[in-house]
Every structure is written in structure tokens, then in C-alpha cells.
């Protein structure tokens, strides 16, 4: 019952997300992105080779996977020129930085559940949060939530499992 899990865990977040505007980068972040772009635009044409995307992203502290890079390139380089302008690069990096913020938000939520600091969300943790949020869920429904998120079968939800289940929601 992922929907209950999502509901129980992000009641206040939903309202906040609806009210907050799309994430904006700070001037400092934009400057860092510009510097990384300029570093690879050695000939000053205002474009970089799409093959340099991974290296440029790494210079900004990201470790993109090969499949992720291929997907980004196919979305950006629709004409197959092999080049990317600053605007495209800024769009990609804004999205990546937003994802990084999202992960941090999810991990903060995880810590709220994991009040006993075991590194896992137990049935007891989930029951406490549901009660605090005024969610009237049966033990069976709570256990179903744990079972749905629990990939390694240990009966609890670790950070990776929590990230996975939360990213499946439309809340993040």
C-alpha cells in the first residue's frame, strides 16, 4: 500500500511542494555551472562537445551513470550535432541540482521516522509517525507499507529502500 505510505509520511510536504515555486539556482551555483561550461568551451564557440558532459558534471560534484548521460544527450542533442550550448547545459545542471536537493529532503524525512537512530525504519517507527500525523491505519496496513518498501527482506526499511519508494511517488 504505497499510497498509504506516501500519505502517512508526507502530509505536510505535499502542501509545501504545491505552494513553493520551481527550484531556482543561486547566483553562485549559476556561476559555478558557467565556469565548468567555459572550461570545456576551449575554442570559445559557446558550445561544448556532448562527450564532455560527464566530465563537466563531475567537475560540479556529480557522478552520472553512463545510461543517465546517454539519456541526457538524446534529450538535448536532438539534431545529432554532438554539441551542447550553455542554455542546455544549465537546464541539465539545474535539474541535477534539484534532484540532489530532493534526495536531501527525503533523507531528512527518513531521519524523522528513524527516531531511534538505527539506520532503519521499523514497524514501531512507522506506527509512531502514523499516530503523530493522526493517520488511523491498522497494524496490517502499516506492515504492508513496510513490506512494500523492504527489498532485502529484513522486515525494516533502510535509507536506500526509503529513497526508492519515495521517488516512486509524485511528491518528490
Curated annotation (Swiss-Prot):
PANTHER family: CALCIUM BINDING PROTEIN (PTHR23050)
Any GO molecular function: G-protein beta/gamma-subunit complex binding
Segment forming the signal sequence: none
Residue span of region Required for self-assembly: 2-25
Protein's recorded name: Centrin-2
Family, similarity comment: Belongs to the centrin family.
Residue span of region Disordered: 1-31
Modified residues (N-acetylalanine): 2
InterPro entries xref list: Centrin_CML-like, EF-hand-dom_pair, EF_Hand_1_Ca_BS, EF_hand_dom, RNA-helicase_DEAD-box_CS
Subunit architecture: Monomer. Homooligomer. Interacts with CCP110, SFI1. Component of the XPC complex composed of XPC, RAD23B and CETN2. Component of the nuclear pore complex (NPC)-associated TREX-2 complex (transcription and export complex 2), composed of at least GANP, 2 copies of ENY2, PCID2, SEM1/DSS1, and either centrin CETN2 or centrin CETN3. The TREX-2 complex also associates with ALYREF/ALY and with the nucleoporin NUP153. Interacts with USP49. Forms a microtubule-associated complex with POC5, POC1B and FAM161A. Interacts with CCDC15.
The EF-hand domain, residue ranges: 28-63, 64-99, 101-136, 137-172
Residues that, per the record, bind Ca(2+) 1: 41, 43, 45, 47, 52
UniProt KW keywords: Acetylation, Calcium, Cell cycle, Cell division, Cytoplasm, Cytoskeleton, DNA damage, DNA repair, Isopeptide bond, Metal-binding, Mitosis, mRNA transport, Nuclear pore complex, Nucleus, Phosphoprotein, Protein transport, Repeat, Translocation, Transport, Ubl conjugation
Chief location bin: cytoplasm
GO annotation, biological process: cell division; centriole replication; microtubule cytoskeleton organization; mRNA transport; nucleotide-excision repair; protein transport; regulation of cytokinesis; spermatogenesis
Compartments where located: Cytoplasm, Cytoskeleton, Microtubule organizing center, Centrosome; Cytoplasm, Cytoskeleton, Microtubule organizing center, Centrosome, Centriole; Nucleus; Nucleus envelope
Cross-link (Glycyl lysine isopeptide (Lys-Gly) (interchain with G-Cter in SUMO2)): 22
Remaining remarks: Binds two moles of calcium per mole of protein.
Residue numbers bearing the Phosphothreonine modification: 26
Binding residues for Ca(2+) 2: 150, 152, 154, 156, 161
Amino acid at each position: 500500500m504505497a499510497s498509504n505510505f506516501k500519505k502517512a509520511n508526507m502530509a505536510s510536504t505535499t502542501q509545501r511542494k504545491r505552494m513553493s515555486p520551481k527550484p531556482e539556482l543561486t547566483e553562485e551555483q549559476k556561476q559555478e555551472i558557467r565556469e565548468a561550461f567555459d572550461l570545456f568551451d576551449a575554442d570559445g564557440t559557446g558550445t561544448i562537445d556532448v562527450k564532455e558532459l560527464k566530465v563537466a558534471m563531475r567537475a560540479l560534484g556529480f557522478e552520472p551513470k553512463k545510461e543517465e548521460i546517454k539519456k541526457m544527450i538524446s534529450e538535448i542533442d536532438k539534431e545529432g550535432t554532438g554539441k551542447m550550448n550553455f542554455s542546455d547545459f544549465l537546464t541539465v545542471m539545474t535539474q541535477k541540482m534539484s534532484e540532489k536537493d530532493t534526495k536531501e529532503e527525503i533523507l531528512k524525512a527518513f531521519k524523522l521516522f528513524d527516531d531511534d537512530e538505527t539506520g532503519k525504519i521499523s514497524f514501531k517507527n512507522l506506527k509512531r509517525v502514523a499516530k503523530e500525523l493522526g493517520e488511523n491505519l491498522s497494524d496490517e496496513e502499516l506492515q504492508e507499507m513496510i513490506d512494500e518498501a523492504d527489498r532485502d527482506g529484513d522486515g525494516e526499511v533502510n535509507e536506500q529502500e526509503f529513497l526508492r519508494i519515495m521517488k516512486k511517488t509524485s511528491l518528490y
